[in-house]
UniProtKB/Swiss-Prot annotation:
This is Cytochrome b. It comes from the Eukaryota. PANTHER family: CYTOCHROME B. One of its GO terms (cellular component) is mitochondrial inner membrane. Its main location: mitochondrion. Belongs to the cytochrome b family. Binds 2 heme b groups non-covalently. Signal peptide: none annotated. Component of the ubiquinol-cytochrome c reductase complex (complex III or cytochrome b-c1 complex) that is part of the mitochondrial respiratory chain. The b-c1 complex mediates electron transfer from ubiquinol to cytochrome c. Contributes to the generation of a proton gradient across the mitochondrial membrane that is then used for ATP synthesis. Heme b b562 binds at residues 83, 182. Gene3D superfamilies: Cytochrome Bc1 Complex, Chain C (1.20.810.10). It is a multi-pass membrane protein. It comes from Brachytarsomys albicauda. Coiled coil: none annotated.
Amino acid sequence: MTNIRKTHPLLKIVNSSFIDLPTPSSISSWWNFGSLLGVCLIMQIATGLFLAMHYTSDTTTAFSSVAHICRDVNYGWLIRYLHANGASMFFICLFLHVGRGIYYGSYMFTETWNIGIILLFATMATAFMGYVLPWGQMSFWGATVITNLLSAIPYIGTTLVEWIWGGFSVDKATLTRFFTFHFILPFIITALAMVHLLFLHETGSNNPSGLNSDADKIPFHPYFTIKDVLGILVLLTILTAFTLFVPDLLGDPDNYISANPLNTPPHIKPEWYFLFAYAILRSIPNKLGGVLALILSILILAIFPLLHTSKQRSLMFRPITQVLYWILVADLFTLTWIGGQPVEHPFIIIGQLASILYFSIILIMMPISGIIENKILKLN
């Protein structure tokens, strides 16, 4: 008799995705982040669900409802900090996952890559709206500043901002709709993640060499399930350490002050995982230009397949582009640091130079280095 996992309509989907999936034998730990992102998503939905049971999305009670969760709900503090730090772990895994995709040329699977970009945008939107919910100072002013950027859109900008706010300022209507969207988006992300996997399984996984690995594949289970379990244990260890020892390390102390529209915090800044984009936004002295640069800083990922000039897929055997890649990584760290600094000398000029370097490496230097490497290796 054929095994039920191969015949049952539902189980055979699971089987072909996680059990009998032919996987390149050479994929390294950099391929673990997909499963880690899945774990992060499930964990965020679970903790978020329990938080939503006690949270109230009203401007008068939102801040105190979060305090109530931390003080009075059984293990409420744990759920709240797992959710907050879980978001940080989510973004660490996301950035590493995208970074792996760029390094090993995984963007050549264009459908998978494009769904991934949509997933990245959806996750960023979810995280931004979640940051508004505790209704602290940084929540309120972050929401005000970021939504206000849309007013830079010619002609319809102001109307659009007021439409999103549901009034003439960030208020009760804004908080309620942000809570609604923050609740629904993770489920949309889950659906998109399934589509992401569907497209990936059409082509099969890439591997570190960037070469065709059809001749050397092994079943996903048990080899990679056990490898993923190790990754998950490491992830949970780091998350637990953060949650129990330094729960507020990645947050902003200003968010422990209840939202006050009459008092602006000295430095308005988003969560750490948006700082690189925030630095690019601030480095352009024009509002519309800044907004465009902000969007393009992430949307630029979509043209990676078009900018690929090398005859090799991966950077594994491309030392010149490798150097550029790691300069790009260092540049992103620099932008993240600048995003958290006040707008004054020398941070302004450093931010502008780092922003120029970011776009230059991706749009100019990497494509040129690909052509140079082809010439050196006589691959044309």
